[in-house]
Regions:
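Short aromatic/hydrophobic "clamp" motif used to bind/position activated sugar donors
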Residues: 73-75
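Conserved donor-nucleotide/metal-binding helix-loop-beta segment in metal-dependent transferases, i.e.
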Residues: 82-113
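Catalytic core and acceptor-binding pocket of nucleotide-sugar-dependent glycosyltransferases
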Residues: 107-110, 117-155
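A short, glycine-/small-residue-rich helix N-cap motif at loop->alpha-helix starts
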Residues: 52-61
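Conserved hydrophobic/aromatic beta-strand scaffold that supports enzyme active sites
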Residues: 65, 100-102, 117-119
Length: 155
């Protein structure tokens, strides 16, 4: 399902997101024929992660892209398809001053961020504020850490 889906998305990206690069994260569980095909596409960058384990944390590899300096990043699952609605909403976001963007694929999706499209630009996750207990009334209530460091703790 995912290998077929990424092929379909790579082909559709040429139509919906002309000029964009599709970054595909994978490990050794993906058939080499699929990887060879992906490497031949002019709109694909393949990112290899060693190993053969199918772990839940593999789904977090995509978040590494959010820390590419000065990049505009859109993320979605390989089993989700692009749509005219999505492209219109992404264009509206790019024309706005907002740094973060979320699209829910269905009106009943109530989780803050699902596998539908989300985007980040202007290095908006370079530093993430984490609430810290107040030691005294004059202390700063938020500690900022590098977003990449926080992500590395979960992968």
């Amino acid at each position: 399902m995912y290998t077929y889906g990424i092929i379909e998305n790579v082909l559709d990206a040429k139509k919906y997101y002309d000029g964009w690069i599709v970054r595909v994260h994978h490990n050794d569980t993906v058939p080499t024929g699929i990887i060879d095909w992906l490497k031949k596409q002019d709109n694909v960058e393949v990112v290899y992660h060693p190993g053969t384990k199918k772990k839940a944390s593999n789904t977090l590899w995509r978040f590494e892209d959010l820390f590419i300096k000065d990049a505009i990043v859109l993320s979605r699952d390989a089993d989700s398809r692009f749509s005219e609605r999505e492209v219109k909403l992404v264009k509206e976001w790019l024309d706005s001053t907002k740094d973060f963007h979320i699209i829910r694929d269905h009106k009943h999706h109530m989780v803050p961020i699902l596998a539908g499209t989300f985007g980040c630009r202007n290095n908006c996750l370079e530093y993430i504020g984490i609430p810290v207990p107040l030691r005294n009334i004059n202390s700063i209530p938020t500690q900022y850490i590098e977003g990449k460091s926080l992500m590395d703790e979960f992968i």
